[in-house]
């Protein structure tokens, strides 16, 4: 899988960019939120990427930030939401706005995004509830820093929701290494 590309920006044709990485040109689809923040053609850039393989195409999607890529990955797991719609959602609202809309169960905000209907918005709210807050910086998530943030990410990646992960973090000692903290948190969650 291609996780990151760094190279010279050759072309900007919304929502696609052409990136030259050591003589190889990569066409990368980017959400408009990232597109507007790109430097001028000829400048060096780095994009975090998601590689999607379909029967008829191999596509690269690029993101300026890790939370943006995490949101994209979460969105494409939802039934009826493909990469194109996920890109549209991330182009229509910031990652923080998306996390906030999901945390507050605001379908009306999601319906404003082109291509997202009432049913899709309700499905997004249902399937992403409790999964995006800490990943994407929603204000309802637990405030953590340093090793605790890494432990929280690990717990969320293992499928625990925000509430469970936050409860496990409270059981940890103040100064703990990430690997030990994950073990402690998992023990706390299994009690």
Swiss-Prot record:
Residues 140-142 are annotated as: Flexible linker. Keywords: Cytoplasm, DNA damage, DNA recombination, DNA repair, DNA-binding. It is found in: Cytoplasm. It comes from the Bacteria. SMART domains: HhH1 (SM00278). Residues 143-191 are annotated as: Domain III. One of its GO terms (molecular function) is four-way junction helicase activity. InterPro entries: DNA_helicase_Holl-junc_RuvA_I, Hlx-hairpin-Hlx_DNA-bd_motif, NA-bd_OB-fold, RuvA, RuvA_2-like, RuvA_C, RuvA_C_sf. Residues 65-140 are annotated as: Domain II. GO terms for biological process: DNA recombination; DNA repair. One of its GO terms (cellular component) is cytoplasm. Residues 1-64 are annotated as: Domain I. The RuvA-RuvB-RuvC complex processes Holliday junction (HJ) DNA during genetic recombination and DNA repair, while the RuvA-RuvB complex plays an important role in the rescue of blocked DNA replication forks via replication fork reversal (RFR). RuvA specifically binds to HJ cruciform DNA, conferring on it an open structure. The RuvB hexamer acts as an ATP-dependent pump, pulling dsDNA into and through the RuvAB complex. HJ branch migration allows RuvC to scan DNA until it finds its consensus sequence, where it cleaves and resolves the cruciform DNA. Has three domains with a flexible linker between the domains II and III and assumes an 'L' shape. Domain III is highly mobile and contacts RuvB. Belongs to the RuvA family. Homotetramer. Forms an RuvA(8)-RuvB(12)-Holliday junction (HJ) complex. HJ DNA is sandwiched between 2 RuvA tetramers; dsDNA enters through RuvA and exits via RuvB. An RuvB hexamer assembles on each DNA strand where it exits the tetramer. Each RuvB hexamer is contacted by two RuvA subunits (via domain III) on 2 adjacent RuvB subunits; this complex drives branch migration. In the full resolvosome a probable DNA-RuvA(4)-RuvB(12)-RuvC(2) complex forms which resolves the HJ. This is Holliday junction branch migration complex subunit RuvA. It comes from Verminephrobacter eiseniae (strain EF01-2).
């Amino acid at each position: 899988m291609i996780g990151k590309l760094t190279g010279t920006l050759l072309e900007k044709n919304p929502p696609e960019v052409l990136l030259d990485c050591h003589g190889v040109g990569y066409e990368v689809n980017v959400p408009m939120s990232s597109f507007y923040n790109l430097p001028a053609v000829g400048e060096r850039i780095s994009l975090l990427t998601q590689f999607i393989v379909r029967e008829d195409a191999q596509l690269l999607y690029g993101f300026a930030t890790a939370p943006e890529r995490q949101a994209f990955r979460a969105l494409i797991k939802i039934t009826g939401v493909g990469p194109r719609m996920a890109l549209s959602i991330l182009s229509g609202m910031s990652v923080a706005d998306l996390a906030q809309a999901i945390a507050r169960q605001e379908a009306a905000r999601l319906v404003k995004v082109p291509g997202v209907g009432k049913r899709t918005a309700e499905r997004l709210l249902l399937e992403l509830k409790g999964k995006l807050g800490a990943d994407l910086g929603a204000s309802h998530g637990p405030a953590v820093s340093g090793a605790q943030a890494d432990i929280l990410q690990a717990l969320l990646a293992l499928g625990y929701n925000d509430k469970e992960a936050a409860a496990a973090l409270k059981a940890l000692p103040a100064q703990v290494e990430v690997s030990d903290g994950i073990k402690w948190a998992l023990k706390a969650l299994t009690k």
